[in-house]
Amino acid sequence: EGFKKMLDGIAELDGYAYIGAGRDDGEDAGEHSAIFYKTSRFDLLDKGNFWFSETPDVPGKGWDATCCNRICSWGKFRDKESGKVFYFFNSHYDHQGKVARRESSKLLIARIKQIAGTDATVFATGDFNAVPTDEPMVTLASDGLLLDSYDLSEQPRYGTEGTYNSFKTDSEMMNRIDYIWVTKGTKVKKYAV
C-alpha cells in the first residue's frame, strides 16, 4: 500500500517502474496496490485494476466494507531472459467487513481466471487482512487455482510467523495477513518474513 508521492519516490530507483492506480479514483487519489518491476528484466505486456465491490470496474466500496475502497492491480509480464510470460495481481482487502473479504476472494479468483485463464503462471500477493483459517483464505485455497507459498518452500521457512504487529514495534508478530499465492508448477525456493 502506498500513496502516489511515496511510490514516485521509490520509482526514482534506477531501472524500476510501477503500475497500479489509486483506489479512490482509478488515477492518483488514495492508496495504490502498486506492482514494481525491473524494466531491464521484464516487459510489461498488459495491465489493469479492479475494485473489490459489486461494481468492480468503477471505484467503490463493496458489500459490508465501511472504510475504504479496496483495489487490485494486475500486470502481465514477459521475462526478457527466459521469455516466460506471467501475471501478477496485488490486492488489499477490507479490514472490517467479513462479507467484503469473503466476496473479495471470490472476485479475485474470478478475475484471475477471466484475465489470465487457468493455465497461466500467476502470482497473487497482498494484504488480505485475514489469517489462514479465516473464510477469505479458505475460499482462495479451496478453489485450487492458487497455492499458498508459505506451504511450498523448498527450504525451511525463516523469520517471524506473522506479518502484522498492530503497529507495535515490540510485539510478537503472530498474525499472518500478507500472502504470496502462486499457481501450480511454481517453484518456491525460500519463504521468509
What are these regions (language model features)?
Residues 24-28, 96, 129:
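Glycine-/small-residue-rich active-site loops that bind phosphorylated ligands and cofactors
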Residues 99, 103, 110-122, 130-193:
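Metal-dependent phosphoester-hydrolase catalytic domains
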Residues 1-3, 29, 68, 98-105, ...:
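Solvent-exposed, acidic/flexible segments
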Residues 2-85, 192-193:
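Structured beta-strand-rich core segments of catalytic domains in phosphoester-bond hydrolases
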Residues 13-18, 82-87, 117-122, 144-147:
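Loop/turn elements at helix/coil->beta-strand transitions in domains of secreted/extracellular proteins
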Residues 1-16, 100-118:
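Divalent metal-dependent phosphoesterase catalytic cores across multiple superfamilies
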Residues 91-93, 126-128:
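Active-site metal-binding loops of divalent metal-dependent hydrolases
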